[in-house]
């Protein structure tokens, strides 16, 4: 058996250190998205839209979650497009879990580090910069303060996962147009690649391109639910038509998947989430097959890998069941209920080391990013006084220069 790294130490899937019921209101959140104008009158039986400023959420964690984050000096950034939430999850000086939330409508792909975070939203791509110097804190507890410095309007592209190229440019999965894109100074996006089976760029979400794996600072692999080249063609092909595509060669390197998501290259392997089955695993390139490693009880979406440890996002079904997916049968076989939350797992032993669980109005997560070297982060929102009053600057003016 391989030796465990410090990140893999102290598996503690039992017990709860923190259980918080929170009802968000105007005073609790930083920004509130304006309601969209409906295209048509809603059905009398339709579920009312969720008010993003007034949701009730209960969070619980494994007993060792806070200490694990603290001892490894790492934090998590999570998104939930359903509730428009970004959660920064860190630890305080006592090793207790710290949750810091902000509202960004339809928060989707997120990727970041100690200095910078990118976030995909409903119609903008956000860039946040940390304004704190080393060993500096704000509000006496936060060692990183991510401030929105740029929001590029791209339109509603159903933006999914993001990556950072070695030249510093952000690349994103443009799901609506079935392509990979970069930002354009003039237009909504610049298409840089599309799957070989997609005949044209059209706003039709043909194959549900969704996940992106970066390798050596370049986009290398993507996941798609199927190879459809017709409008919305993926919805009837969720069971076993999923593929992984090599962006450089256009080769299908894995097939027969069920709603694959979140490919990640780590330590010589391509890991991904076969969401329709509930399994985390890796790709056998010789057989072009998925090798399942461990089952997680939920629809898997959002994966971040740090050393031999992964953070896996889990979501509940939208209509009580994962209809047409093997995941339903797997849950029934294990007498398990689906989760909404995060499981920290060892890629060596496939054990769950720690976990976070959400209950209440939040039932779906989208993306996860480890923030190495960050202990307790915060993020400035759009509707608090901080967005107006928190001003920092750099200067090229020599001190003491006379007027």
Q: What feature does the model see in each segment?
A:
Residues 347-403:
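Blade-level signature of beta-propeller repeat domains, shared across WD40, Kelch, NHL, RCC1
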Residues 59-71, 103-116, 152-169, 198-220, ...:
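Beta-rich, blade/repeat-based domains predominating
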Residues 97-102, 136-151, 190-197, 254, ...:
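Beta-propeller fold detector
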Residues 91-93, 131, 184-187, 247-249, ...:
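Short loop/turn segments that connect beta-strands within beta-propeller blades
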Residues 95-163:
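Blade-loop segments of beta-propeller domains
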Residues 61-73, 126-137, 222-239, 313-337, ...:
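Short, conserved, GDST-rich strand-edge loop motifs in beta-rich repeat architectures
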Residues 62, 257-347:
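Loop/turn-rich, solvent-exposed surfaces of beta-rich toroidal or solenoidal domains
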Residues 78-81, 118-124, 164-165, 170-177, ...:
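Conserved beta-strand positions in repeat-built beta-propeller and related beta-rich domains
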């Amino acid at each position: 058996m391989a030796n465990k790294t410090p990140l893999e130490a102290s598996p503690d899937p039992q017990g709860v250190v923190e259980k918080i019921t929170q009802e968000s209101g105007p005073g609790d959140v930083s920004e509130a998205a304006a309601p969209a104008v409906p295209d048509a009158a809603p059905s009398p039986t339709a579920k009312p839209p969720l008010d993003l400023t007034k949701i009730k959420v209960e969070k619980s964690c494994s007993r060792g979650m806070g200490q694990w984050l603290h001892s490894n000096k790492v934090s998590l950034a999570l998104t939930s497009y359903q509730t428009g939430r970004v959660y920064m999850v860190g630890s305080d000086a006592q090793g207790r879990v710290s949750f810091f939330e902000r509202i960004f409508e339809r928060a989707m792909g997120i990727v970041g580090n100690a200095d910078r975070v990118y976030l995909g939203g409903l119609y903008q791509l956000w860039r946040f910069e940390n304004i704190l110097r080393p060993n500096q804190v704000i509000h006496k507890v936060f060692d990183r303060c991510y401030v929105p410095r740029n929001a590029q309007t791209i339109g509603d592209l159903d933006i999914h996962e993001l990556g950072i190229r070695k030249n510093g440019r952000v690349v994103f999965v443009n799901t609506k147009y079935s392509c990979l894109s970069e930002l354009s100074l003039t237009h909504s996006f610049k298409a840089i690649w599309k799957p070989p089976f997609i005949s044209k760029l059209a706003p039709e979400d043909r194959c549900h391109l969704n996940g992106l794996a970066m390798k050596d600072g370049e986009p290398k692999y993507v996941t798609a639910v199927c190879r459809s080249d017709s409008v919305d063609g993926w919805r009837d092909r969720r069971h076993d038509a999923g593929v992984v595509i090599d962006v450089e060669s256009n080769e299908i390197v894995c097939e027969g998947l069920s709603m694959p998501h979140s490919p990640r290259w780590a330590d010589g392997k391509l890991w991904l989430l076969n969401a329709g089955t509930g399994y985390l695993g890796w790709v056998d390139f010789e057989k072009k097959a998925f090798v399942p490693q461990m089952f997680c009880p939920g629809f898997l979406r959002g994966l971040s890998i740090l050393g031999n440890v992964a953070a896996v996002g889990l979501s509940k079904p939208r209509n009580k069941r994962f209809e047409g997916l093997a995941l339903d049968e797997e849950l029934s076989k294990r007498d398990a209920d689906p989760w909404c939350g995060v499981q920290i797992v060892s890629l060596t032993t496939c054990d769950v080391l720690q976990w976070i669980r959400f209950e209440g109005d939040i039932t779906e997560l989208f993306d996860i990013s480890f923030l190495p070297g960050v202990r307790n982060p915060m993020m400035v929102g759009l509707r608090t006084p901080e967005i107006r009053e928190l001003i920092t600057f750099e200067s090229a003016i020599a001190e003491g220069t006379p007027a």
